[in-house]
Design a protein with these regions (language model features):
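Peripheral interaction segments used for macromolecular assembly
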Residues: 1-73
Length: 73
């Protein structure tokens, strides 16, 4: 899987159905396995960094337009 394949998908929290944010980076381990997604929660606030980490095991479904995650944000 390439970052470009998932980068433009909406990240949606299964807990409340709300969009969390956009993928800005991924963390990969030494074996090349994706460890987590780095999500920019509030991209319009230039004064406050609000990146969050979504662990790969929190991802429940990757669809055509949406990635569903189980996260307590």
């Amino acid at each position: 899987m390439y970052l470009s394949e998932i980068q433009n998908k909406d990240i949606v929290n299964l807990k409340d159905g709300k969009k969390i944010g956009n993928i800005v980076d991924i963390e990969i381990d030494n074996n090349g396995t994706i460890h987590s997604l780095i999500i920019q929660k509030n991209k319009f606030n230039i004064f406050k960094s609000s990146d969050i980490e979504i662990k790969w095991n929190q991802i429940k479904k990757i669809g055509e337009d949406v990635i569903l995650v189980d996260n307590n944000i």
